[in-house]
């Protein structure tokens, strides 16, 4: 396991990187098991366990992802998250949401009809832009940051389009 990196608020891990308390050589010598660094502490392992929030291509992409993330976060706990003026009208029509919900609620399965919440989040956010946190983990739950009217909002949505939205973690 990896404990110290997860003590931060968000963790961005480039592909082809490893972090952990011990490496493959220690596992081999102590347990006699032959595992690779990637299997032990690579980005795929950590994204599935919830340790890594974002997997990116390389260190440059990690810096870009960090900058993208910082656009949604306040400088400290005593101030609000940054407001960005938007040209996206707050009162615009969201016909796709209306169609999606009408089809779901008018279907024979009613409230049990799967709804893809990515569509709803995209329709609600300014210009359809949002940042999903831990996109590789728990596809049945969407956790994201976005903006409405230039103000930062957070989403935690049960995505019934995946595994009927059942919480399985």
Regions found by a protein language model. Give the residues of each.
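Charge-rich, low-complexity amphipathic helices
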Residues: 26-27, 33-34, 68-69, 84, ...
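Short acidic (Asp/Glu) and glycine-rich catalytic loops that position anionic groups and cofactors
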Residues: 23-24, 43-50, 91-102, 154-158
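Short, exposed beta-strand "edge-strand" segments with a Pro/Gly-rich flavor and a Y/T-containing core
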Residues: 32-35, 50-57, 104-115, 160-167
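Non-catalytic terminal/interface segments that mediate subunit docking, oligomerization
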Residues: 111-169
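Terminal amphipathic helices with adjacent charged low-complexity linkers/tails
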Residues: 57-121
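Generic secondary-structure boundary/loop-capping signal
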Residues: 16-18, 23-28, 32, 37, ...
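Conserved catalytic cores of soluble enzyme domains
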Residues: 1-78
